[in-house]
């Protein structure tokens, strides 16, 4: 089954979709939780930061509202600690625009790498190995990473030379398209795996 690499962790596709749904729901909650502005701010006094970043000290809400009206700006609650609420004078429209722009940029910078999986036995037939190699090459050309897994049961699990041979034979077939990011290592007594990534051109 294809796997997803998300922030350094391997998760199944079904779990990935659940995570994506949770992210969407979280984003929806974020949109609903807009910052308190102007007369929606419930504190009678708060520390006021002006539009230039200067700390004006503790100011009464009525005075701050007058100041905001005179400057054609908004009061935005940026620190809601009841013992020390902090409010800033700014253009709320511009403020929300900048926040959305930063979020969009952050999403662009995020990368989700999909990982395909190839599972073989040490005794796999040559034509089957060639088919899986061709499949892997196609995935690599599309940018996928490939997890190569060798399952060895019974006495074959102790034949390390056979396990290494099947990997080496496979790698010779796919080497033009991929390189080894994680070498073949034992995941359990009966399973060995390696991680292959598209070769940089």
UniProtKB/Swiss-Prot annotation:
Keywords, comma-separated and alphabetical: Cytoplasm, Initiation factor, Protein biosynthesis
UniProt xrefs under InterPro entries: T_IF-3_C_sf (IPR036788), T_IF-3_N_sf (IPR036787), Translation_initiation_fac3_CS (IPR019813), Translation_initiation_fac_3 (IPR001288), Translation_initiation_fac_3_C (IPR019815), Translation_initiation_fac_3_N (IPR019814)
Subcellular location: Cytoplasm
Pfam families assigned to the protein according to its UniProt record, in alphabetical order: IF3_C (PF00707), IF3_N (PF05198)
Keyword Protein biosynthesis on entry: yes
Molecular function via GO: ribosome binding; translation initiation factor activity
Residues of the signal peptide: none
Superkingdom: Bacteria
Summary of subunit composition and partner proteins: Monomer.
NCBIfam families per UniProt: infC (TIGR00168)
Family: Belongs to the IF-3 family.
UniProt-recorded name of the protein: Translation initiation factor IF-3
The species this protein was found in: Mycoplasma pneumoniae (strain ATCC 29342 / M129 / Subtype 1) (Mycoplasmoides pneumoniae)
């Amino acid at each position: 089954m294809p796997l997803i690499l998300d922030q350094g962790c391997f998760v199944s596709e079904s779990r990935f979709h659940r995570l994506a749904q949770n992210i969407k729901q979280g984003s929806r909650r974020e949109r609903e939780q807009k910052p308190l502005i102007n007369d929606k701010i419930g504190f009678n006094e708060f520390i006021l930061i002006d539009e230039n970043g200067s700390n004006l000290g503790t100011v009464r809400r009525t005075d701050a509202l007058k100041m905001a009206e005179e400057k054609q700006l908004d009061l935005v609650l940026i620190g809601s600690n009841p013992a020390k609420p902090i409010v800033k004078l700014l253009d709320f429209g511009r403020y929300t625009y900048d926040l959305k722009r930063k979020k969009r940029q952050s999403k662009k910078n995020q990368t989700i790498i999909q990982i395909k999986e190839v599972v073989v036995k040490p005794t796999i037939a040559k034509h089957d190995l060639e088919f899986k190699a061709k499949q892997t090459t196609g995935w690599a050309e599309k940018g996928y990473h490939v997890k190569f897994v060798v399952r060895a049961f019974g006495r074959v699990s102790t034949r390390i030379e056979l396990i290494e041979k099947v990997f080496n034979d496979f790698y010779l077939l796919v080497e033009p398209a991929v390189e080894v990011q994680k070498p073949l290592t034992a995941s359990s007594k009966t399973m060995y795996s390696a991680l292959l990534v598209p070769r940089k051109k």
